[in-house]
Amino acid sequence: FFIKLVEICSEKHDIPIAMHLDHHEDYNEIINAIDIGTKSVMIDASHLDFEENIKKVQMVVEYAHKFDVTVEGELGILGGQEDDLVRDDKDSKYTNPAQAKEYVERTGIDSLAVAIGTAHGVYKEEPKLDFERLAEIRAVVDIPLVLHGASGVPADQVKRAIDLGITKVNIATELKMPFAETLREVLINNPNESDPRKYFGPAKESMKKVAIEKILMCGSNGK
């Protein structure tokens, strides 16, 4: 139902909308998402060893490509928390350029999420991206590269990452926080308010403002 709703909105506003299933590890859940119409999926097997990662991703790619569904894989491990998935920063592991080349060739994925110094969630200190590593990956991998954990990364670093080959930038925390903060503020100031339109509206506007800022930062406006 939701997928059809989004498709209708896309047609009405004449803009491309990508329905993407992000960070899933379960093969059956990914297959189900494809079967109901999702056009882009991410299989996150980055926590597995190199060969197991490849094997699991190959299975998803084989099924997805039958239906012209694009697949994003991940090599390297980001610390922090993504929804219910928590990984300690000490377990983070940067993407190896040589492995990235082999990984892309053997899996047949359409885009690659790389670990170059970002993390999911809120940063304890300003992140410093490994641009040299990113350039090395770009030199041997010719598919779109994805930057996860971009919330809180300074704009100049994001822009440089894009210049060096990042095609997709994932931002969640910086969108969720203003939504939640505004929602709390409205309900605290209006404790008897029961109309969802009155408290969700301002929250959505706060999120929208940040979304516009990020779209402009990435140079994605009008595309």
Question: Language-model features: where?
Answer:
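Alpha/beta enzyme core
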Residues: 2-13, 23-141, 155-171, 177, ...
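Structural detector of well-ordered beta-strand residues that form the stable sheet scaffold
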Residues: 18-22, 71-72, 146-148
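Short catalytic/ligand-gating loop segments at beta-alpha or beta-beta junctions
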Residues: 116, 148-151
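Short beta-alpha connecting loops at secondary-structure transitions
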Residues: 192-200
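Family-specific functional microsites
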Residues: 200-203, 207-211
